[in-house]
Amino acid sequence: MTKKEYKIHIIGAGISGLIAARVLENHGYHPIVIEATDRVGGRVKTDIVNGYQLDHGFQVLLTSYPAVQKHLDCDALELQSFLPGACIFKSNDQKTIGDPLRNLSLLIPTLKSGIGTFSDKLKILKLNQKLKKKTLEAIFLESEQTTLEYLQRLGFSNAMIKDFFKPFFSGIFLETELGTSSRMFEFVYKMFGEGHATIPKSGIEAIPKQLLSNLKTTKFNYNTKVESLKDGKIILENGTQLESHYTIVASEASGLVSKLKNQSIEWKSCTTLYFETDTRVINKRLIGLISKSGTLINNIFYNSSLESATTPLKEILSVTVIDRRGLSNESLIEVVRTELTELCGITATSFIKLYNIPRALPKLQDLKYEMMPSETRLTDHLFLAGDTQLNASLNAAMISGERAALGVIESITSIV
């Protein structure tokens, strides 16, 4: 059997599935991707609404991710960079902090901010140096504790944790108690320190679109839902059965594979709301954090502070809510508007769109950075991919997709 005669199916056209297809193509195979929706991207999507570029959730691309450097053409994405810092809204005031070693304009605001003690600032410098010397593999071999325990053991003040670490990393981890593994904290902190947080000029969906554009021999079946996988067959929701020599599941597998039915993934959710405003209250390319406990809003960002492929007529503001507390969309919009006014001094907002994202990030235990291709194999002909296999990051999604494809290739070559 020639390479192109192998029927290799990939279920899911998210980042992992697209990377798997790319690796298979590079080795001479012609994979078939089955996607339930009408386009690639999975959770990485962008809409154009009334001339505004709206990502599905507040998502950034970290340029320091090794897998990003390997698989993406960052220049072609025209990445728009955030400044390395944050604007913190506290007690009806606005404070700016950041890394003056990377952007000198943040030096004076940081010194004047009153956020954290002098000792906290020294501890941040020490943490920066520690993680600079630490490999990613070493980070994921450390014993796990919660991020909160980790920060407390490093001696950061309660105020520093409350005002900066909690709102900033709650927005990344999508949980408000910093209960996420310290491995993930060290990994993300190191990646932020060694590169830039960015958004492609055309929105976050430019990432899967670029991966798609590089595929030449992969076939895509959109709007096609898989019911189950059994004995080398893919059974579609409409009853059609597809023969498959090898299948990579690059979506949640528990509902498709009988032996995984009791191992479903738990997910973290979030809600992102977009508003149109006349002016900005944050004049730099910085995320805005709410330090007050008990608020709905976790963070805000003026997307219009970065250059985009569209030309918005007014300022566009994104608001991230981690726990909407069961509120209806209408009630949520009203409470968020009230908080924007009371906490940030933002008035005269015009609502554009709301994205409720029930499966924003997977809840994972025993986080890993890497895996062998053989570790992606569930059965002789079935392989698993996705960030759920390693850790909740775009980097992990790419690595797992590559490893699953290599696992398939190893299986084929071992029997040839």
Give the predicted meaning of each segment.
Residues 46, 69-90, 157-163, 267, ...:
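A short alpha-helix-loop-beta-strand transition element characteristic
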